[in-house]
Regions:
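Acidic (Asp/Glu-rich) sequence patches and key acidic residues
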Residues: 1-107
């Protein structure tokens, strides 16, 4: 599982990637060249802090993958990838909205 919080490593996480979503993130990592996903997957079992500039770039990069036309909606695996993109955009956007860095913590 991977948890996200704003700024402080010791604060309670506001969002999580659970074990059931790991397959979707691994597939996105393999299929697409999305720097935030690559960084997240490479640091999945570590703690990491993304600054505002990185988050703004991540938001822009992932927005390109939001359209349902990019996915086969008959495929459960592709729907899960799309939902994870939506979730990650929401997580990143939340941090940007609050103008705070995003701390990820793997366990």
């Amino acid at each position: 599982m991977y948890s996200f919080c704003l700024d402080n490593r010791h604060s309670k996480g506001f969002a999580y990637i659970d074990y059931s979503e790991e397959k979707a993130i691994a597939t996105l990592y393999q299929k697409h060249n999305i720097p935030f996903i690559i960084d997240l997957w490479n640091r999945y079992y570590e703690d990491h802090i993304w600054g505002l500039e990185e988050l703004e770039n991540a938001q822009r990069d992932m927005m390109a993958y939001m359209s349902v036309t990019d996915y086969d909606m008959n495929s459960k695996e592709e729907r899960e990838q799309m939902y994870l993109i939506y979730k990650l955009i929401a997580i990143v956007s939340y941090a940007i909205f609050h103008q705070r860095s995003l701390v990820g913590s793997g366990d």
